[in-house]
Amino acid sequence: MSMSLLNDVQKFIEAHPGCTSGDIADAFAGYSRQRVLQSASKLRQSGRVAHRCEGDTHRHFPRLTERAQDPEPQPVRETRPVRNFYVGTNDPRVILCLTRQAEELESRGLYRRAATVWMAAFRESHSQPERNNFLARRERCLRKSSKRAASGEEWYLSGNYVGA
């Protein structure tokens, strides 16, 4: 990119605020369209000009100084509420019930079921230390659970399956 083309494109944008990429390319017919649009892109990336998308149309504006006012009022963007990551009710009675159920399952050696209940307690709680504790208990249950491997007779290999 030649500096003179960059400067010329910037001066054009300053003289014609709100111009589109097509307007800029048409104004510099002596240069290839691609080169002119690359110059406009470099100006946007370096912060020397601003742009705004209106549907499929990109409009270019001179970078505003502290003293300058916005040429036209910006439309107010719709703000979305921050996503709530807690899905449970945070009811202490429900959490206590789930905790007791998980501990009872652990005492009976049903570690996979207990891990599932610990996860339900995790979802129900909003307290971060409590949630961390539930995850730790769940991990411990998963480590203790036996990795069940099916024996050869339980497998249906190709050629051995007799359908009903």
UniProtKB/Swiss-Prot annotation:
Pfam families: PerC
Protein's name in the database: Uncharacterized protein YfdN
Domain of life from the UniProt record: Bacteria
The organism's taxonomic lineage, starting at the top: Bacteria, Pseudomonadati, Pseudomonadota, Gammaproteobacteria, Enterobacterales
